[in-house]
């Protein structure tokens, strides 16, 4: 079975070293109950119609959730991710062409004081 696109993006980011220092999760945020842990969550977020033998656009959300009081570290990680994708839009043949959608959004804070950036990517892929 072919991995879902959010899993392929997770693998691409991991291979590029972009997830170092983060607990990596899929689909939904699962609180690690340790405010010193930063978390990165990969999940699908729709896209275009998926047709056989045609390219399709898959949208992937990547939530970058910083450790408590480590806002600068989370912001730096977000910038590294965006810079990497911009410089390497075709780094992984399993992802196809990836691009950031909407640049870097305004962060939000959780009740615990964690900063959260929600990045969205469009992956154009077809076989």
Predicted regions and their residues:
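Small/polar-rich, solvent-exposed N-terminal microdomains that initiate assembly or binding
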Residues: 1-52, 88-94
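Short, charged interaction patches at domain edges and termini
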Residues: 1-12, 45-55, 96-127
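Intrinsically disordered, low-complexity, compositionally biased regions/tails
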Residues: 18-21, 25, 70, 76, ...
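A residue-level signal for beta-strand positions that form part of recognition/binding surfaces
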Residues: 38-39, 59, 118
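Generic alpha-helical scaffold signal
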Residues: 52-56, 72-75
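Active-site-adjacent structural patch at catalytic or cofactor/ligand-binding sites
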Residues: 57-66
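Mid-chain, well-packed structural core segment of small domains
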Residues: 65-90
